[in-house]
């Protein structure tokens, strides 16, 4: 089930489900969006800058990409057929399935993908193909949208919130979620009061250690 932000239903859950629900981003957390986007861009003649891993902003990654065009290019990619075939990020497949199959956790994905219905269907198809029934639902926001509003229904719930964008992880922490930041070159120097992890093995150990 995918839900666009303009028709988003606040999903109700009882206390037993709450304890086994994990909120997570998709790109840069479950899926390797950056690698797939890089391949797609290079096929279209864009070349990577020497320090492309150090910035979150894509116009710093490609020599030919101007800041004013970056969001449009991302939206074009996110609404292309390629978005249905992103690979899993690092060891996410193994540990997401362990958390689900061995410990009963389910994952609600909150992703700033697109409001395009076809793109949303491809995103859910991609996630379910890799992670199966571990995916409880997929909430799709506009391309690059902030997640403040989408996270607000979970205020003070104490749910885990797994992200790679520091601003979104910070918001989760501020409203009472257990934020976990997945480390990348663009965020590795972010100072925060919540855990920063390199892979899903570390996420698994954090969650099971507190279970």
Please place each PLM-identified region on the residue numbering.
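Short, positively charged and aromatic/hydrophobic N-terminal segments
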Residues: 2, 7-13
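Active-site neighborhood of HAD-like aspartate-dependent phosphohydrolases
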Residues: 17-69
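A general structural motif
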Residues: 17-19, 104-106, 156-158, 176
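Anion (oxyanion) recognition and catalysis
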Residues: 42, 97-101, 173
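Short, basic/glycine-rich phosphate-binding loops at helix/coil junctions
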Residues: 64-79, 104-108, 131
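Substrate-recognition element of Asp-dependent hydrolases with the DxDx(T/V) motif
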Residues: 83-88, 92-127
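Substrate-recognition "cap/lid" segment bordering the active-site pocket of phosphatases
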Residues: 110-160, 166-170
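Asp-based, Mg2+/Mn2+-dependent phosphohydrolase catalytic module
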Residues: 149-155, 159, 165-211
């Amino acid at each position: 089930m995918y839900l666009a932000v303009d028709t988003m239903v606040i999903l109700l859950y009882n206390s037993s489900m709450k304890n086994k629900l994990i909120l997570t981003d998709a790109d840069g957390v479950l899926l390797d969006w950056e690698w797939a986007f890089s391949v797609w861009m290079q096929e279209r003649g864009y070349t990577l800058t020497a320090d492309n891993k150090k910035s979150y902003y894509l116009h710093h990654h490609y020599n030919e990409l101007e800041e004013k065009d970056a969001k449009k290019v991302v939206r074009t990619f996110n609404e292309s057929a390629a978005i249905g075939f992103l690979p899993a990020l690092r060891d996410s497949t193994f540990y997401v399935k362990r958390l689900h199959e061995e410990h009963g956790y389910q994952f609600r994905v909150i992703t700033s993908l697109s409001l395009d219905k076809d793109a949303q269907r491809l995103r859910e198809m991609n996630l379910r193909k890799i992670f199966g029934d571990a995916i409880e639902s997929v909430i799709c926001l506009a391309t690059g949208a902030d997640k403040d509003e989408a996270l607000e229904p979970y205020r003070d719930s104490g749910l885990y919130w797994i992200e790679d964008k520091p601003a979104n992880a910070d918001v989760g922490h501020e409203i009472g979620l257990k934020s976990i930041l997945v480390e990348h070159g663009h965020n590795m120097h972010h100072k925060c009061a919540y855990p920063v992890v390199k892979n899903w093995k570390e996420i698994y150990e954090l969650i099971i250690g507190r279970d």
